[in-house]
Amino acid sequence: MKDIVIVDCIRTPMGRSKNGVFRHTRAEDLSAALMKGLLERNPEVDPEELEDIYWGCVQQTLEQGFNIARNSALIAGIPHKVAGVTVNRLCGSSMQALHDATRAIMNGDGDIFMAGGVEHMGHVPMTHGIDFHPGMNKSVAKASGSMGMTAELLSRKFGITREQQDEFGARSHRKAHEATVEGRFAKEIYAMNGHNADGELVRVTEDEVIRPETTAEGLSQLRPVFDPANGTVTAGTSSALSDGAAAMLVMSADKAKELGLTPRVKIRSMAVAGCDPSIMGYGPVPATEKALKRAGVSIDDIDVVELNEAFAAQSLPVLKGLKLFDKMEEKVNLNGGAIALGHPLGCSGARISTTLINLMEEKDAKLGLATMCIGLGQGIATVFERV
C-alpha cells in the first residue's frame, strides 16, 4: 500500500465572528489565500499536476454555497483543469476532506491533492436555514439538535463538575496565549489581510479570539447557557465562534521524493464512527479506538493529541473514555484548543491536524492523534506518524 504524506499545512489566523478582523473578508478569499499560499511555499509542485481539491464546509449557502471548493480555486488562479469538491461531515468536514484525498491516492486516482476547509461563522451563522425533519424525534432525542444540551448530558453521565469545566476552559486560553507569545503558532499561521476595529486594512498574523485574561474564577461567574436552571455549560467553556480556514498539501510518498519535497508526516490510519446523537460529543472515543486498531498501536503509543474542544463538558468525558484524563498536561492540546481559538466548523479538522503536526515536530514525537466529535452523533480520527 502507498504511503500518503503531508508535505505542508497552514491555517489562517482565527478571527472573531462578531465584528472581527475578517468581517469584510469572504470565506472564498480565506480559502483562496491558503490555496495560493501552499503553492507559493512549494514551488516544486506544478499546479497542473493537482488532481483535485477536497474542501470542507458545513453551511454551504450564501457565500459558502455552490461548491466553495471550486469557487475558491478559481479565485486563487488554480488551473481550470484541476477539480474541486466541497465536503460536509459537519464538524469533521475538513478532516474528512483529508481522508478523501488520502483514499484517492491509495486507489491510484491521483498523486497530488489539496485538502482543507473553511467556515465564516460571522457571515453564515451555524443555524442558518436549518430545518430538521420532525420525524427524527421518533428515533432521536429532540435535544440532540442542541449541541450544548448533548454536552450537558455527557457531563452528567461522566460526573464532570462545573469547576473542572471552568479550569479546562481557562487552560485552553492560557496555553493558546502562551503558544502565541512564544511564537509556537508562527509556523502554522499564514498571514492574511483583515480590518481592525477602526476599519483600517491590516495584516493579521495572530489569532484574534484568544482571551489571555481568562481565569477559572472569572469563568465561574458565567451563567449556564443551554440549561439555565440545572446546567453547567457556559459560553466560556464552549468553543468560541470564529472565522477561519486551514489547508494541507497531500501526496504519495513516491511523488514527494520525485519532487524533492520532505514529508512532514504520513497518514498512519483513519476512522469514523457513530454514537448516540444525544451524547454526540463522545464520538471521538469509538472513532479513535478504530483508528488505533487500524494503526496497530495503543493510546499509550500516542505522543501528542489534538482533541477538538467543542465544549469542556464534552472534551473531559472523551479524555476519560480514552484514558487520557490523567495525561492531559503531557499530551493533550498543548497549545490550547477550540475554546480559545474557536471552532469554524468546516475548518477545524484541518486546523487541529495542522497544529498537531507542528507540535509533533516541536516535541520530536513519533505518533500523533487528531480527533473530534461531530453533530448528531459521529466521531472522526486520524493517526499521524513522523517520517
From Swiss-Prot:
Any one GO BP annotation for this protein: phenylacetate catabolic process
Molecular function as annotated in GO: acetyl-CoA C-acyltransferase activity
Superkingdom, taxonomy of origin: Bacteria
InterPro entries, per database record: FadA (IPR012805), Thiolase (IPR002155), Thiolase-like (IPR016039), Thiolase-like_sf_Thiolase (IPR050215), Thiolase_acyl_enz_int_AS (IPR020615), Thiolase_AS (IPR020610), Thiolase_C (IPR020617), Thiolase_CS (IPR020613)
Residues annotated as catalytic: 91, 343, 373
Localization of this protein: Cytoplasm
Enzyme class: transferase
Signal peptide from the UniProt entry: none
Pathway entry: Lipid metabolism; fatty acid beta-oxidation
EC number annotated for this UniProt entry: 2.3.1.16
Gene3D superfamilies for this protein: 3.40.47.10
Pfam families linked: Thiolase_C, Thiolase_N
A GO cellular component entry from the record: cytoplasm
Keywords: Acyltransferase, Cytoplasm, Fatty acid metabolism, Lipid degradation, Lipid metabolism, Transferase
Reactions catalysed according to its record: an acyl-CoA + acetyl-CoA = a 3-oxoacyl-CoA + CoA
Cited function: Catalyzes the final step of fatty acid oxidation in which acetyl-CoA is released and the CoA ester of a fatty acid two carbons shorter is formed.
Subunit structure: Heterotetramer of two alpha chains (FadB) and two beta chains (FadA).
Stated family: Belongs to the thiolase-like superfamily. Thiolase family.
Name of the featured protein: 3-ketoacyl-CoA thiolase
